[in-house]
């Protein structure tokens, strides 16, 4: 088990807030000394069902504000994010279990490769408006990150083992009272645990772990004028 303090980052690639939080955590891994970050794929659809939550995109007023909020947040962190025009149609038709199982296969082999593939899925969906739901989509993602046997990885992901791991991860998230993604569980050095939702709690996590407050690259290192 990774040493403490530790951040367990539960994510699903359908979630744009997971994308934003992922990119921020990738920067913080080099800035927050002594903090371990574990990236844990789970299935957001099951989390929403178990918690009784509904996707923001399915609530008209909330979906409008969500898109505005996403653009603001992505701009602040310098993350290229454009909601795909067919997003509503896609989330009604497809699930992300296939994508998440592919990531689990990669995670078994090479954590860094899994992280590159997860980023490619987010960029594909949230920057290029391309699907990430079917076998051919997965093959294209894997080729983009340099996997030499993409078809074999996709086929391996269909083994029952990986849906079991995915649901175990999902159930752990539900046990932590997760109701959306990303779900962030912080383990402090004294052994206590603290849960956070979303991509706008980094200042609280930094304070909890007594780490530097996170800033986008253009502001990192600047001193306050106050």
From Swiss-Prot:
Keyword annotations: Transferase
Molecular function terms from GO: glutathione peroxidase activity; glutathione transferase activity
Cellular component aspect of the GO annotation: mitochondrion; peroxisome
GO biological process: glutathione metabolic process; innate immune response
EC number from the UniProt entry: 2.5.1.18
Pfam families to which the protein is assigned, alphabetical: DSBA
Record field: catalytic activity: RX + glutathione = an S-substituted glutathione + a halide anion + H(+)
Keyword match tRNA-binding: no
UniProt key word Transferase: yes
Main enzyme class: transferase
Ligand binding (glutathione): 15-17, 53, 199-200
Family named by the database record: Belongs to the GST superfamily. Kappa family.
Protein name: Glutathione S-transferase kappa 1
Upper lineage: Eukaryota, Metazoa, Ecdysozoa, Nematoda, Chromadorea
